[in-house]
Amino acid sequence: MSSRRLLKAAEAIREVVANAIVTEVRDPRVRDVTVIGVEVSPDMREAKVKVSVMGDETQKNLSLRGLQNSAGFLQSKIANRMDTRYTPKLRFEVDRGQENAMTVSEILARIQQEKEGATDDRDQNDSGEDATPHSND
């Protein structure tokens, strides 16, 4: 199957799943879920749905269980939308990209603060040395 067709299928699945989660899935565990992307296997039998979940690890695990319980319903929505021989079996996983980006941002901010603190210390030392009188005896 062409990669272009797989990309189109992945985008269609992402759209159907995202819309169904927002408008049709009634499970409160999936309330804070955002669909980030979908990867479809070459034979179109499996689709890995990457999601982002607001909350702590407990909330993420609950949301994944809620999504897994809703997988059959979501697959039926996909089957109605796509004209393929097989409807992909959905697997859900939390996309850690957002968390990793936040961690990197925090580390960079900390490094920047340390640099600014070191620069301020040097400036104070420099100004202190310049302020002392020099005798030319």
UniProtKB/Swiss-Prot annotation:
Matching InterPro entries: KH_dom-like_a/b, RbfA, RbfA_dom_sf
Major subcellular location class: cytoplasm
Region (Disordered): 110-137
Biased composition (Basic and acidic residues): 112-125
GO biological process, alphabetically ordered: maturation of SSU-rRNA; ribosome biogenesis
The entry's keywords: Cytoplasm, Ribosome biogenesis
PANTHER family (UniProt xref): RIBOSOME-BINDING FACTOR A, CHLOROPLASTIC-RELATED
Subunit structure: Monomer. Binds 30S ribosomal subunits, but not 50S ribosomal subunits or 70S ribosomes.
Family: Belongs to the RbfA family.
Name under which the protein is recorded: Ribosome-binding factor A
Natural source organism: Rhodopirellula baltica (strain DSM 10527 / NCIMB 13988 / SH1)
